[in-house]
Curated annotation (Swiss-Prot):
GTP binds at residues 17-22, 34, 38-39, 65, 124-125, 127, 155-156. Disulfide bonds: none annotated. The keyword Lipoprotein applies. This is Ras-related protein Rab-9A. One of its GO terms (biological process) is positive regulation of exocytosis. A motif (Switch 2) lies at residues 64-78. One of its GO terms (cellular component) is phagocytic vesicle membrane. It is a lipid-anchor. Keywords: Acetylation, Cell membrane, Cytoplasmic vesicle, Endoplasmic reticulum, Endosome, Golgi apparatus, GTP-binding, Hydrolase, Lipoprotein, Membrane, Nucleotide-binding, Phosphoprotein, Prenylation, Protein transport, Transport. The modification Phosphoserine is found at S179. Belongs to the small GTPase superfamily. Rab family. Mg(2+) binds at S21, T39, D62. It comes from Homo sapiens (Human). Its cofactor is Mg(2+).
Length: 201
């Protein structure tokens, strides 16, 4: 890949069994493994891509969703550029737990400005016909909790998987653009010669 590449850390959070590992593997390797076991602690994979002319290396972190693994996963939240909150559309409890996952991430990642941090919401397993969470419910949650982008995905058949991760990159880039603008307005030019000053002795 030509050109300078930025490294973005993206973390997948959500209940155990919602398909976080499958989503990561589908996106990075374009494979789906029906025998995938629950993650213990954390795992990550890298993916090089170009989004809107920006070359990016996305470091995707997959975390264990079970409560007993909390102490293993939370140290890895820091330094994340984007968080993909994930639930399964056939599991209403995993949807109800999104708020808890968001709070846990904000606390352990030490997010300074939660209202502007880029979250993307994924409703996974739309290939399953019996759903417990409607599209409208999920969209309403996203509107009420920060106007987050929402994608209904299937790691099994790859529906919207690439689109969701690419949107995560766009959100990070937009956040960086805002930060750069703020920084540029307050920078000090170290190369500018100081104005001569007069003093009386």
């Amino acid at each position: 890949m030509a050109g300078k590449s930025s490294l973005f850390k993206v973390i997948l959070l959500g209940d155990g069994g919602v398909g976080k590992s499958s989503l990561m593997n589908r996106y990075v390797t374009n494979k789906f493994d029906t025998q995938l076991f629950h993650t213990i602690g954390v795992e990550f994979l890298n993916k090089d891509l170009e989004v809107d002319g920006h070359f990016v290396t996305m470091q995707i972190w997959d975390t264990a969703g079970q409560e007993r693994f909390r102490s293993l996963r939370t140290p890895f939240y820091r330094g994340s550029d984007c968080c993909l909150l994930t639930f399964s559309v056939d599991d209403s409890q995993s949807f109800q737990n999104l708020s808890n996952w968001k709070k846990e991430f904000i606390y352990y990642a030490d997010v300074k400005e939660p209202e502007s941090f880029p979250f993307v919401i994924l409703g996974n397993k739309i290939d399953i016909s019996e759903r417990q969470v409607s599209t409208e419910e999920a969209q309403a949650w996203c509107r009420d909790n920060g106007d987050y982008p929402y994608f209904e995905t299937s790691a099994k058949d790859a529906t919207n998987v690439a689109a969701a991760f690419e949107e995560a990159v766009r959100r990070v880039l937009a956040t960086e653009d805002r930060s750069d603008h703020l920084i540029q307005t307050d920078t000090v030019n170290l190369h500018r010669k100081p104005k001569p000053s007069s003093s009386c002795c």
